[in-house]
Amino acid sequence: MIFDGTEKIIGHGAQAEVYLWKGFAYKVFRPDYPAEWIAFEIDQQKAVNALGLCPVRYEKTEDAHTIKMDFVDGIMLEERLNGGYKDGFADLAAAHRFVHSVEAAGTIPNLRESFTSAINSFSLPGITDAQKRRALEIVNAIPEEKRVCHLDLHLQNLMFLKDSKDAFPYVIIDWVNAREGNPIFDYARVFVIFKEFAPFIIDFFMGAIKDDLNKLQSKDAFHDAVGVCALLRLTEHNSDAVRQIVKEYLG
């Protein structure tokens, strides 16, 4: 992507940097990042738009490694919490309920199929075949549902709109992981991220989602789902903390 020098970097991650330029956000991926994965992310966002879950539009550009996006002029829920906001975890729980209230109707990939494929192709030193078999058993044992699962809905992916007049003044971003399936995996995924990076907030999160979890499954099912999500987390972030979660929850 060729900018004119007026662009401003507003975000960065392992795979891409995000720039603000002429009123739009531009996600610029590393040159070696597969173009077909970027095309999938655009298609995924269009599906989410159609389901009414997020108004942010993605568009292709002349550069296959750059996505043009609507700019969300807001602050992360994480920033609100750091500023002393007291209801952040209640808001995070409400965001999950909103996502799970929508049926995917086959418009996004199936969670069970995606997880099964990922586990079958999984290969990392120290991860045993027994752990993989156990993860596959769990994925197939937890009942399938047709609900949308974001699978990355943590404090940095919930944007507060300062000037919004809506009762729920947030926009949920970063939908590339979204799948159609059982919401218990959505909660388990966030639990793993918090346990890895901020274990001191787990009690706040679990307190906020307690009633929602009770409506879904037993405590054992959540425990099992955490093991699966931890195993898959290793494909993104192969850390000692995540390996410990795998050992604790999958054996």
Model feature map: region roles:
Residues 63-76:
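Conserved short submotifs of the Hanks-type protein kinase catalytic core
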Residues 49-62:
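Conserved HxN/HPN-centered segment at the entrance to the catalytic loop
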Residues 83-112:
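Internal "kinase-insert"/substrate-recognition segments embedded within catalytic cores
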Residues 5-39, 46, 78-80:
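ATP-binding glycine-rich loop module of kinase domains
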Residues 180-182, 188-251:
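Helix-rich C-terminal or lid/interface subdomains of diverse kinases
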Residues 157-187:
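Catalytic activation segment of kinase domains across protein kinase-like and atypical kinase folds
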Residues 101-151, 155, 159-164, 171:
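An alpha-helical support segment within catalytic cores of ATP-dependent transferases
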